[in-house]
Each structure stands twice: as structure tokens, then as C-alpha cells.
Amino acid sequence: MPYEILIPRQVERQIAKIPREFATRILDDLEGFADGLDYKRYDVRKVVDSPKTAPRYRMRSGNYRVLFFILHNRMVIEVISIRRKKTGMDY
């Protein structure tokens, strides 16, 4: 059973600013990940400094990074932000 993806209004605004081809790829990658939670295929990793009680994850999609929570008990992926990768590892 696939996970539901929650995208808050703030993140929708971020997506609207991204060129359409990249935004489509990001959303396709999110939907693919939600179907099977295949961490390796979609290059999903836990963010290093995230708390153990509510770990954050990041997904690489081209030059963009998607930050999100996975709420396993509710089968929900809640997107926090979508940003373009800078030269450093600062999100």
C-alpha cells in the first residue's frame, strides 16, 4: 500500500518557482518512493543531525534536494522543503 504524500502550501510555492521539467521529475520521484519506500533507488538518506524521535530524510532529484518526514504509523510522507543544492552541503 503506497504512502500518502503531504505537500504544505509553502512547499507548493517552492515547487511553483522551479522550472517545470525539474518540478515534474521531483514529484515523479516522490510518488515512486511513496509506492515502495526504495531508499537506494531514490537516493534517500536520513539527515545527520535530525532527532531520533522524528528523523528527517532527504532525497536527491537532479540538482534539487527534498527534505521530508516519514510518518510510518499514519503511512504519510510529509514534505518539509524543496531546494536547489548549493556548492556546500547547506540546505
Residue ranges and their predicted role:
Residues 1-2, 33:
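A short, ordered amphipathic alpha-helix with a cationic face
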